Every structure is written in C-alpha cells, then in structure tokens.
C-alpha cells in the first residue's frame, strides 16, 4: 500500500468524519488505499486499490492484471474482475465481460485465460458472466464495489457461471 507523510499532514482529514480520519492516518502517515511499486528511477506506479485486491488461498491477486489479459481477447470490449466468496479458498476470481461480438462464450474466455502466459493458475477466473455493460464513474473508471454487490445477487440467482 502506498503511504505518504507531509509536514502539512494537519491539513488532511475527512471533513466531519473523525472515524475515517483515524483509520487512514497513523503516526503522521496517510494510508492512501492505493497499491503500487517503486521502480529503480524512484517513480511510483499505481497498480490498483487495496480494496480491490483479491486474496485467494493466501495469494494476492490484482484485478487489473486479469482484466488486461481478458481485454486482449478479440471478442472482448472490456472486463471487470472481482473476488467472490469461496469456502475453500476464501475468495476466487470472477470476471464480468462486455462482448464486442455476441458469439463470445464463457468457454472461449476460460481457454484464453488458461493459455495466457501472463496468468498463473491461481489467477484464472473461476466464474464468468457476460454482460451488456459495466458501471463506470463520470471519469470512466470501473466501479468495482458495485460489481461486488452485483456479484452477490448474481450468485444467489445462478447468473455467475463457475468453471
């Protein structure tokens, strides 16, 4: 997680939300909730949000990596990856996919992921749902927390197909 400190820390707070301020600040450091890496040139690359990280059988999985692989498929317009509850692993990867081509099947997606050199087997989606659209913010970012809520309903209704 990316954490920062500044002499102006006292200027940062959650307005009228003391609980959140205490949660995000610790001993003068702001815990941003962003996950990233620091390279040899001292640049920080943000790779996702801590809240979006999936923990499956003790492995940390970042949705952006799986989304990038899914989005390489020629019949995929875009995708969103989230974690769904699993009794054995804690969470497993679920993929929501918007198709460019209506002939796209779950089997094609599964085959694409399992043959990708970019994904280890623990990162393969275990459930898929082909949808018409994904929720986005006004700036175009996918809203993963809405997808997690949607997945709860889809699991209850049998719409997420486990593979």
Per-range role (PLM):
Residues 9-12, 26-27, 157-159:
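Conserved ATP-binding loop and adjacent catalytic segment of the adenylate-forming AMP-binding
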Residues 149-156:
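Short arginine-rich
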Residues 5-6, 12-13, 20-23, 35-123, ...:
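AMP-binding/adenylate-forming catalytic core of the ANL superfamily
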Residues 118-142, 158-163:
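AMP-binding/adenylate-forming catalytic domain of the ANL superfamily
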Residues 2:
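Glycine-rich active-site loop/lid that clamps phosphate-bearing ligands
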């Amino acid at each position: 997680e990316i954490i920062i400190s500044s002499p102006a820390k006292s200027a940062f707070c959650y307005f009228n939300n003391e609980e959140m301020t205490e949660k995000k600040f610790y001993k003068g450091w702001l815990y941003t909730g962003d996950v990233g890496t620091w390279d040899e040139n001292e640049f920080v690359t943000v790779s996702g949000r801590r809240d979006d990280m999936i923990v499956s059988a003790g492995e940390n999985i970042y949705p952006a990596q799986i989304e990038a692989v899914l989005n390489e498929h020629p019949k995929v317009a875009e995708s969103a990856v989230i974690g769904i509850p699993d009794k054995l692993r804690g969470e497993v990867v679920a993929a929501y996919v918007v198709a460019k081509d209506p002939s796209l099947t779950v089997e094609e997606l599964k085959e694409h992921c399992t043959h990708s050199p970019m994904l280890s087997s623990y990162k393969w989606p275990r459930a898929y749902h082909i949808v018409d659209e994904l929720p986005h913010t006004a700036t175009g970012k996918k809203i993963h927390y809405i997808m997690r809520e949607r997945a709860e309903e889809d699991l209850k209704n049998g719409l997420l197909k486990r593979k």
